[in-house]
């Protein structure tokens, strides 16, 4: 039985994944599954650089605006949703595509992650105990028990703090050392495309994108989310949102908030590139040297297909 062909487009923030993905989808009769951890949330549009209906140009997109900002979402949930969508898209004669920058989400689909089974009764007992504690106490406990995890988790990201504490108590080791077993080969016929450009060019694009976000109403978007009661939600710790809260609270100037967002976005892009290079076999394209048309042409010649595929 032939494997289902799957096109994956990855790359750092602001590199141009959206525009290229639309052109590829047109060329291969594709539908796009968003591989972004924040674009699943309704009302978090500007800060996540969510694609607009106009930008979609009629290409169907999935896993965008499916949750409220106070609802949790994980790689395990993404895996279930994405696998169902891939089969559905393919069954309708279309080419499934995953586009995004949340590496663990995408990897969970490609490499058959099996999320570790745990003692659910013990886990619930621990979670119930920790749920009664305030965030300062929770974070202090995590710092005492698992310094490495605490250094990588924001104090306001209550769900991740809870998960790290619970994992440590259950397994007596840091959640940062957790290994999720996966097979070395994918059940899909996968073509992974990576977009990149020289670091100075990418950083300049990031800086300009942040300024555009502010012009488009990022501060007002964050204020609206706060007014709806989402201030303490895990989603609000995402880059693009957490930097605006101190400005709204009167703790920093708008210029400082913008600089913080630009710096955090640049750091995130660097981490994304490192992660993708270490975790996946990718064919990279420099978007600063190649036109979208030339990239699409090269990609179309290498797209996985079965004997029944007909690409327009």
Curated annotation (Swiss-Prot):
The entry marks the following residues as binding ATP, namely 11-18
Pfam families annotated for this entry?
IPPT (PF01715)
Name the coenzymes or cofactors required: Mg(2+)
Q: Its Enzyme Commission number?
A: 2.5.1.75
Q: List the disulfide bonds.
A: none
Query: What keywords tag this UniProt record?
Result: ATP-binding, Magnesium, Nucleotide-binding, Transferase, tRNA processing
GO aspect biological process, one term: tRNA modification
The record's listing under InterPro entries reads: Dimethylallyltransferase, IPT, P-loop_NTPase
Gene3D superfamilies named among the record's database cross-references: 1.10.20.140, P-loop containing nucleotide triphosphate hydrolases (3.40.50.300)
Region Interaction with substrate tRNA, residue ranges = 159-163
Where in the chain is the site Interaction with substrate tRNA? 102
Q: Which residues bind substrate?
A: 13-18
One MF annotation (Gene Ontology) recorded for this entry: ATP binding
For whether the record's keyword set contains Nucleotide-binding, the answer is yes
Q: Which family does it belong to?
A: Belongs to the IPP transferase family.
The UniProt function text for this chain reads: Catalyzes the transfer of a dimethylallyl group onto the adenine at position 37 in tRNAs that read codons beginning with uridine, leading to the formation of N6-(dimethylallyl)adenosine (i(6)A).
Sorted alphabetically, which PANTHER family does this protein's record hold? TRNA DIMETHYLALLYLTRANSFERASE
Q: What is this protein called?
A: tRNA dimethylallyltransferase
Starting at the broadest rank, the lineage of the source organism is: Bacteria, Bacillati, Bacillota, Bacilli, Bacillales
């Amino acid at each position: 039985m032939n494997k289902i062909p799957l096109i994956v487009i990855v790359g750092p923030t602001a590199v141009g994944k959206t525009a290229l993905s639309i052109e590829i989808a047109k060329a291969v009769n594709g539908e796009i599954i968003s591989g972004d951890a924040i674009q699943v949330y309704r009302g978090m549009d500007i800060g996540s650089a969510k694609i607009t209906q106009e930008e979609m140009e009629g290409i169907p997109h999935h896993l965008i605006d499916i949750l409220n900002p106070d609802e949790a979402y994980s790689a395990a949930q993404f895996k279930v949703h994405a696998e169902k969508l891939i089969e559905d898209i393919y069954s309708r004669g279309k080419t499934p595509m995953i586009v995004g920058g949340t590496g663990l989400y995408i990897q969970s689909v490609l490499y058959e992650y099996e999320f570790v089974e745990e003692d659910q009764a013990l886990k619930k007992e621990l979670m119930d105990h920790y749920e009664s504690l305030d965030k300062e106490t929770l974070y202090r406990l995590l710092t005492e028990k698992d310094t490495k995890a605490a250094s990588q988790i924001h104090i306001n990201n209550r769900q991740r703090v809870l998960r790290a504490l619970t994992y440590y108590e259950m397994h007596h080791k840091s959640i940062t050392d957790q290994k999720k077993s996966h097979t070395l080969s994918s059940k899909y016929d996968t073509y992974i495309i990576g977009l990149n450009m020289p670091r100075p060019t990418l950083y300049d694009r990031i800086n300009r994108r942040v300024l555009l976000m502010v012009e488009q109403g990022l501060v007002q978007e964050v204020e609206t989310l706060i007014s709806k009661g989402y201030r303490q939600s895990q989603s609000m710790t995402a880059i693009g949102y957490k930097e605006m809260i101190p400005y709204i609270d009167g703790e920093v100037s708008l210029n400082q908030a913008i600089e913080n967002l630009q710096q955090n976005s640049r750091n995130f892009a660097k981490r994304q590139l490192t992660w993708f290079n270490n975790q996946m076999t990718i064919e990279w394209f420099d978007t600063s040297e190649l036109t979208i048309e030339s990239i699409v042409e090269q990609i179309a010649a290498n797209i996985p297909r079965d004997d029944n595929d007909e690409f327009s």
